[in-house]
Protein backbone atom coordinates (compact mmCIF):
# COMPACT_ATOMS: atom_id res chain seq x y z
CA UNK A 1 0.00 0.00 0.00
CA UNK A 2 2.89 2.38 0.70
CA UNK A 3 4.29 1.95 -2.83
CA UNK A 4 1.33 3.72 -4.49
CA UNK A 5 1.93 7.16 -3.02
CA UNK A 6 5.59 6.97 -4.06
CA UNK A 7 4.62 5.94 -7.57
CA UNK A 8 2.08 8.73 -7.78
CA UNK A 9 4.71 11.19 -6.61
CA UNK A 10 7.12 9.99 -9.29
CA UNK A 11 4.43 10.31 -11.94
CA UNK A 12 3.59 13.82 -10.75
CA UNK A 13 7.26 14.83 -10.69
CA UNK A 14 7.72 13.40 -14.16
CA UNK A 15 4.60 15.18 -15.40
CA UNK A 16 5.75 18.48 -13.90
CA UNK A 17 9.20 17.98 -15.42
CA UNK A 18 7.63 17.41 -18.84
CA UNK A 19 5.48 20.55 -18.45
CA UNK A 20 8.52 22.57 -17.38
CA UNK A 21 10.51 21.20 -20.31
CA UNK A 22 7.76 22.05 -22.77
CA UNK A 23 7.44 25.52 -21.25
CA UNK A 24 11.17 26.09 -21.56
CA UNK A 25 11.22 24.84 -25.15
CA UNK A 26 8.18 26.99 -25.98
CA UNK A 27 9.81 30.05 -24.45
CA UNK A 28 13.05 29.46 -26.36
CA UNK A 29 11.10 28.88 -29.58
CA UNK A 30 9.08 32.07 -29.05
CA UNK A 31 12.19 34.12 -28.39
CA UNK A 32 13.98 32.61 -31.38
CA UNK A 33 10.95 33.08 -33.66
CA UNK A 34 10.38 36.61 -32.38
CA UNK A 35 14.02 37.49 -33.00
CA UNK A 36 13.89 35.96 -36.48
CA UNK A 37 10.72 37.87 -37.34
CA UNK A 38 12.24 41.13 -36.11
CA UNK A 39 15.37 40.54 -38.17
CA UNK A 40 13.26 39.74 -41.22
CA UNK A 41 11.17 42.87 -40.67
CA UNK A 42 14.27 45.03 -40.37
CA UNK A 43 15.92 43.52 -43.44
CA UNK A 44 12.75 43.78 -45.57
CA UNK A 45 12.15 47.38 -44.52
CA UNK A 46 15.73 48.44 -45.21
CA UNK A 47 15.73 46.73 -48.61
CA UNK A 48 12.39 48.27 -49.61
CA UNK A 49 13.40 51.78 -48.56
CA UNK A 50 16.86 51.51 -50.15
CA UNK A 51 15.34 50.37 -53.46
CA UNK A 52 12.71 53.11 -53.25
CA UNK A 53 15.37 55.76 -52.73
CA UNK A 54 16.96 54.67 -56.02
CA UNK A 55 13.60 54.99 -57.77
CA UNK A 56 13.02 58.46 -56.31
CA UNK A 57 16.55 59.54 -57.25
CA UNK A 58 15.91 58.55 -60.88
CA UNK A 59 12.45 60.14 -60.73
CA UNK A 60 13.88 63.46 -59.54
CA UNK A 61 16.77 63.35 -61.98
CA UNK A 62 14.35 63.15 -64.89
CA UNK A 63 12.26 66.05 -63.57
CA UNK A 64 15.31 68.19 -62.86
CA UNK A 65 16.59 67.59 -66.38
CA UNK A 66 13.23 68.70 -67.78
CA UNK A 67 13.30 71.87 -65.67
CA UNK A 68 16.87 72.65 -66.73
CA UNK A 69 16.04 72.15 -70.42
CA UNK A 70 13.08 74.53 -70.07
CA UNK A 71 15.02 77.20 -68.16
CA UNK A 72 17.84 77.18 -70.72
CA UNK A 73 15.67 77.03 -73.83
CA UNK A 74 16.46 79.83 -76.25
CA UNK A 75 12.79 80.76 -76.74
CA UNK A 76 12.30 81.06 -72.97
CA UNK A 77 15.39 83.25 -72.56
CA UNK A 78 14.44 85.42 -75.52
CA UNK A 79 10.92 85.95 -74.20
CA UNK A 80 12.25 86.80 -70.72
CA UNK A 81 14.64 89.39 -72.22
CA UNK A 82 12.25 90.97 -74.73
CA UNK A 83 9.11 92.63 -73.36
CA UNK A 84 7.58 92.77 -76.83
CA UNK A 85 8.05 89.03 -77.50
CA UNK A 86 4.98 86.85 -78.07
CA UNK A 87 4.32 84.26 -75.36
CA UNK A 88 2.78 81.71 -77.76
CA UNK A 89 6.08 79.92 -78.52
CA UNK A 90 6.93 79.56 -74.82
CA UNK A 91 3.43 78.43 -73.92
CA UNK A 92 3.45 75.84 -76.72
CA UNK A 93 6.81 74.51 -75.49
CA UNK A 94 5.54 74.16 -71.91
CA UNK A 95 2.29 72.51 -72.99
CA UNK A 96 4.22 70.00 -75.07
CA UNK A 97 6.27 69.09 -71.98
CA UNK A 98 3.12 68.67 -69.89
CA UNK A 99 1.46 66.47 -72.51
CA UNK A 100 4.47 64.18 -72.93
CA UNK A 101 5.16 63.66 -69.21
CA UNK A 102 2.29 62.21 -67.14
CA UNK A 103 3.94 63.35 -63.88
CA UNK A 104 3.66 67.04 -64.80
CA UNK A 105 0.40 68.92 -64.21
CA UNK A 106 1.37 72.52 -65.04
CA UNK A 107 4.25 74.82 -65.93
CA UNK A 108 4.83 78.49 -65.17
CA UNK A 109 7.32 81.15 -66.26
CA UNK A 110 7.53 84.40 -64.29
CA UNK A 111 9.90 86.96 -65.79
CA UNK A 112 11.94 89.47 -63.84
CA UNK A 113 9.90 92.34 -65.31
CA UNK A 114 6.62 90.82 -64.09
CA UNK A 115 5.22 88.91 -67.08
CA UNK A 116 3.64 85.51 -66.54
CA UNK A 117 3.16 82.54 -68.87
CA UNK A 118 1.34 79.42 -67.65
CA UNK A 119 -0.15 76.27 -69.14
CA UNK A 120 -3.19 76.42 -66.86
CA UNK A 121 -5.73 79.23 -67.18
CA UNK A 122 -6.37 79.44 -63.41
CA UNK A 123 -2.66 79.98 -62.77
CA UNK A 124 -2.57 82.55 -65.58
CA UNK A 125 -5.18 84.58 -63.68
CA UNK A 126 -2.80 85.02 -60.75
CA UNK A 127 -0.62 88.13 -60.66
CA UNK A 128 3.10 87.77 -61.25
CA UNK A 129 3.92 90.22 -58.44
CA UNK A 130 2.29 87.87 -55.93
CA UNK A 131 4.27 84.93 -57.31
CA UNK A 132 7.54 86.86 -57.12
CA UNK A 133 6.97 87.27 -53.38
CA UNK A 134 6.36 83.57 -52.80
CA UNK A 135 9.03 81.36 -51.24
CA UNK A 136 9.45 79.10 -54.29
CA UNK A 137 10.38 82.09 -56.45
CA UNK A 138 12.80 83.51 -53.89
CA UNK A 139 14.44 80.12 -53.26
CA UNK A 140 15.00 79.58 -56.99
CA UNK A 141 16.89 82.87 -57.24
CA UNK A 142 18.97 82.04 -54.15
CA UNK A 143 20.12 78.76 -55.70
CA UNK A 144 21.58 80.54 -58.74
CA UNK A 145 20.11 78.62 -61.70
CA UNK A 146 20.02 75.23 -59.90
CA UNK A 147 16.79 73.18 -59.61
CA UNK A 148 14.95 73.65 -56.29
CA UNK A 149 12.31 71.30 -54.81
CA UNK A 150 9.33 72.60 -52.85
CA UNK A 151 7.29 70.86 -50.12
CA UNK A 152 3.71 69.74 -50.77
CA UNK A 153 1.20 72.51 -51.42
CA UNK A 154 -2.26 72.95 -52.88
CA UNK A 155 -2.60 74.35 -56.39
CA UNK A 156 -5.86 75.45 -58.01
CA UNK A 157 -6.12 74.05 -61.52
CA UNK A 158 -8.69 74.29 -64.29
CA UNK A 159 -9.07 70.51 -64.56
CA UNK A 160 -9.87 70.10 -60.85
CA UNK A 161 -10.66 72.38 -57.93
CA UNK A 162 -7.46 71.80 -55.97
CA UNK A 163 -4.59 69.36 -56.28
CA UNK A 164 -1.70 68.56 -53.97
CA UNK A 165 1.56 69.04 -55.85
CA UNK A 166 5.27 69.43 -55.32
CA UNK A 167 7.20 71.73 -57.61
CA UNK A 168 10.65 72.06 -59.13
CA UNK A 169 11.75 75.62 -59.79
CA UNK A 170 14.81 77.00 -61.53
CA UNK A 171 16.13 80.46 -62.22
CA UNK A 172 16.31 81.60 -65.84
CA UNK A 173 19.52 83.52 -66.54
CA UNK A 174 21.13 85.13 -69.58
CA UNK A 175 24.54 84.21 -70.98
CA UNK A 176 26.28 86.32 -68.35
CA UNK A 177 24.36 84.72 -65.47
CA UNK A 178 22.03 87.66 -64.83
CA UNK A 179 18.53 86.88 -63.60
CA UNK A 180 15.72 86.90 -66.17
CA UNK A 181 13.00 85.10 -64.21
CA UNK A 182 12.00 81.71 -62.79
CA UNK A 183 10.34 78.61 -64.28
CA UNK A 184 8.24 76.24 -62.19
CA UNK A 185 7.03 72.74 -62.99
CA UNK A 186 4.18 71.41 -60.83
CA UNK A 187 4.28 67.66 -60.28
CA UNK A 188 1.40 65.37 -59.37
CA UNK A 189 1.77 62.38 -57.05
CA UNK A 190 0.48 59.63 -59.33
CA UNK A 191 3.77 57.85 -60.12
CA UNK A 192 5.26 58.45 -56.67
CA UNK A 193 2.12 57.32 -54.87
CA UNK A 194 1.67 54.23 -57.04
CA UNK A 195 5.21 53.14 -56.20
CA UNK A 196 5.44 54.01 -52.50
CA UNK A 197 1.98 52.75 -51.55
CA UNK A 198 2.87 49.24 -52.75
CA UNK A 199 6.07 48.80 -50.78
CA UNK A 200 6.43 45.62 -48.71
CA UNK A 201 6.29 47.21 -45.25
CA UNK A 202 3.83 44.93 -43.48
CA UNK A 203 0.09 45.33 -42.98
CA UNK A 204 0.35 48.61 -41.09
CA UNK A 205 3.59 49.88 -42.59
CA UNK A 206 3.81 53.04 -44.68
CA UNK A 207 6.40 55.43 -46.08
CA UNK A 208 6.61 59.20 -46.42
CA UNK A 209 9.03 61.91 -47.55
CA UNK A 210 10.15 65.06 -45.74
CA UNK A 211 12.66 67.78 -46.60
CA UNK A 212 15.48 69.12 -44.45
CA UNK A 213 13.07 71.55 -42.75
CA UNK A 214 10.86 68.56 -41.80
CA UNK A 215 8.17 69.81 -44.17
CA UNK A 216 6.15 67.02 -45.76
CA UNK A 217 6.79 66.32 -49.41
CA UNK A 218 4.70 63.15 -49.60
CA UNK A 219 2.51 61.20 -47.20
CA UNK A 220 -0.23 58.66 -48.05
CA UNK A 221 -2.49 60.51 -45.61
CA UNK A 222 -2.91 63.95 -47.20
CA UNK A 223 -4.21 65.47 -43.95
CA UNK A 224 -0.65 65.78 -42.61
CA UNK A 225 0.06 68.53 -45.15
CA UNK A 226 -2.34 70.95 -43.51
CA UNK A 227 -2.99 69.59 -40.00
CA UNK A 228 -0.54 70.53 -37.24
CA UNK A 229 -1.93 67.69 -35.12
CA UNK A 230 -1.26 65.12 -37.84
CA UNK A 231 2.21 66.57 -38.40
CA UNK A 232 2.96 66.30 -34.69
CA UNK A 233 1.91 62.64 -34.72
CA UNK A 234 4.65 61.95 -37.27
CA UNK A 235 7.45 63.46 -35.18
CA UNK A 236 8.28 60.21 -33.27
CA UNK A 237 8.89 58.51 -36.62
CA UNK A 238 11.04 61.37 -37.90
CA UNK A 239 13.19 61.25 -34.74
CA UNK A 240 14.34 57.64 -35.35
CA UNK A 241 16.99 57.16 -38.05
CA UNK A 242 17.38 53.38 -37.94
CA UNK A 243 15.71 51.46 -35.13
CA UNK A 244 12.52 50.97 -33.15
CA UNK A 245 10.15 53.69 -32.08
CA UNK A 246 8.72 54.21 -28.62
CA UNK A 247 7.30 50.93 -27.31
CA UNK A 248 9.47 48.88 -29.63
CA UNK A 249 6.59 47.94 -31.94
CA UNK A 250 7.46 49.88 -35.10
CA UNK A 251 10.76 49.57 -36.94
CA UNK A 252 11.77 52.82 -38.66
CA UNK A 253 14.40 53.37 -41.31
CA UNK A 254 15.42 56.58 -43.08
CA UNK A 255 17.37 57.18 -46.29
CA UNK A 256 18.44 60.61 -47.61
CA UNK A 257 17.68 61.02 -51.32
CA UNK A 258 20.93 61.95 -53.15
CA UNK A 259 21.16 65.37 -54.81
CA UNK A 260 18.11 66.67 -52.95
CA UNK A 261 17.02 67.76 -49.48
CA UNK A 262 14.48 64.92 -49.33
CA UNK A 263 14.52 62.03 -46.86
CA UNK A 264 12.48 58.86 -47.35
CA UNK A 265 11.15 57.28 -44.12
CA UNK A 266 9.53 53.85 -43.86
Q: Which sequence ranges carry the predicted segments?
A:
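Extracellular/periplasmic juxtamembrane segments that couple receptor/chemosensory ectodomains to their
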Residues: 213, 221-266
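Solvent-exposed, extracytoplasmic
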Residues: 87-99, 123, 178, 182-224
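Short N-terminal helix-loop-first-beta-strand/juxtamembrane motif that initiates sensory/input modules
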Residues: 59-69, 95-116, 139, 145-147, ...
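Extracytoplasmic/periplasmic ligand-binding sensor regions of membrane-associated signaling proteins
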Residues: 99-103, 113-187
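Juxtamembrane membrane-water interface segments immediately C-terminal to a transmembrane helix
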Residues: 31-64, 84-88
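Extracellular/periplasmic ligand-binding regions of membrane signal-transduction receptors
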Residues: 57-91, 110-124
